[in-house]
Amino acid sequence: MTQYINGQWFAGLGHQVSSINPATGQSIWNGVTATADQVNQAVDAARAAQFDWFMLGFEARLSIVEAYRSELEANKAQLAEVIAQETGKPQWETATEVGAMIGKIALSAAAHDKRTGTETNELAAGRAVLRHKPHGVVAVFGPYNFPGHLPNGHIVPALLAGNTVVFKPSELTPKVAEEMLKLWDKAGLPKGVINLVQGEVETGKALASHPQIDGLFFTGSSRTGHILHQQYAGHPGKILALEMGGNNPLIVKGVSDTKAAVHDIIQSAYISSGQRCTCARRLYIEQGAAGDELIAQLITAVNNIQVGAWNSQPQPFMGSMISETAARGMVAAQATLQALGGVSLVELAQVEAGTGLVSPGLIDVTQIAELPDEEYFGPLLQLVRYTDFDEAIRLANATRYGLSAGLLADNRDDYDYFLARIRAGIVNWNKQITGASGAAPFGGVGASGNHRASAFYAADYCAYPVASMEADSVSMPASLSPGLSI
């Protein structure tokens, strides 16, 4: 039973699909995709449930969402294990993902109040009131890299605002989505408020193009996001929130603590096997002896990164990539850069055939005149040596993306200079660029998004403002407008 529609589990009526543990190549979940008719049923169920869900009021909705938080807390070990098996990420990392899902509840409640709450201003003859209303039925498209946390970051604020949801997870992580919906069901969510449709491209297209959805919240590749943006052209009445990738730069300038810099570089480039949209893809290090020493230490540290299966003991830093196909894609990306003149300082390689396990790579691309502006979504870091800080910033900005960027530097003036000139939605100083606060907005510019920042600002795209002028009774003004006689 792979589809959850109107509070009931159904088998899909499409074709057979399975989910593979990428560290072993073994199937861990099997199901049948949703057809366009089942997608239609899910949207109809969400539509039928929406007004009553909204009319429950915020406190009642929050109470049910809090019950979901309790279910997450009670089942966190089991959910973390499912995420680890299906994504290949190490157990320590998936435990932090479930922790982020739990923390999202309080953050979303606070954001709802701060970003989209109710505000009243008393006037001489009445009052001005600002309220917010839900859009209605929204589709949530989830990614595979954080299959619990990232869709959760759309679903929770959407529900708190009074929307109902049709959730289409990544076809690579269906088991995680199924486990999430079981917890929502146990939390007592009314029928139709969340509906799950599992499937591949055909299922996604049926949902994205459905005339009865009022919005779509997407986390995933820039390519798919741009297709959705084109599809929604001419539909100004629908809200579209796109959270996409990046070709993210990290610049190092004048750092005295080389060991700490190496640590932040590794955390920026190789965490989650490089499968975070905020991961550093390009590293800029000054020419000279200090830069040479930093690179030497970085090479040693990258070679020492432990890679292993999700359940390996001791636990590895890097687990598997999402699939063998993804692993082969990174090997091919490295070969492309080498053919253009890149020199591998640490060779990325597939660790075991038939799996998504790869070792991390570091490649010097300084001599490549036209560096491809691509998001290589894996553990491959491109190194560029520079002599001039302005030139490093110019190169860092030479991308159509604009998600995250960072500077490792002892001098605050250097950071202020960098901050004023860099083009990105997340800009960190002396911190890994994969680090982001849930109490802040999360999003980028350019090909990284469409100005609908998520995280704390997700509340903004989950509701629309309603401005009212109100009085308790009708009354005559002190004087009539010219030309009136009543």
UniProtKB/Swiss-Prot annotation:
NCBIfam families membership: arg_catab_astD, PRK09457.1
Catalytic activity as recorded in UniProt: N-succinyl-L-glutamate 5-semialdehyde + NAD(+) + H2O = N-succinyl-L-glutamate + NADH + 2 H(+)
Keyword NAD: yes
Similarity section: Belongs to the aldehyde dehydrogenase family. AstD subfamily.
Species of the source: Shewanella denitrificans (strain OS217 / ATCC BAA-1090 / DSM 15013)
Residue positions of the active site: E243, C277
PANTHER family (alphabetical): ALDEHYDE DEHYDROGENASE-RELATED
Task performed by this protein: Catalyzes the NAD-dependent reduction of succinylglutamate semialdehyde into succinylglutamate.
Protein name: N-succinylglutamate 5-semialdehyde dehydrogenase 2
Enzyme Commission code(s) on record: 1.2.1.71
Keywords (A to Z) from UniProt: Arginine metabolism, NAD, Oxidoreductase
InterPro entries reported in the protein's UniProt record: Ald_DH/histidinol_DH, Ald_DH_C, Ald_DH_CS_CYS, Ald_DH_CS_GLU, Ald_DH_N, Aldehyde_DH_dom, SuccinylGlu_semiald_DH_AstD
Pathway: Amino-acid degradation; L-arginine degradation via AST pathway; L-glutamate and succinate from L-arginine: step 4/5
GO molecular function list: succinylglutamate-semialdehyde dehydrogenase activity
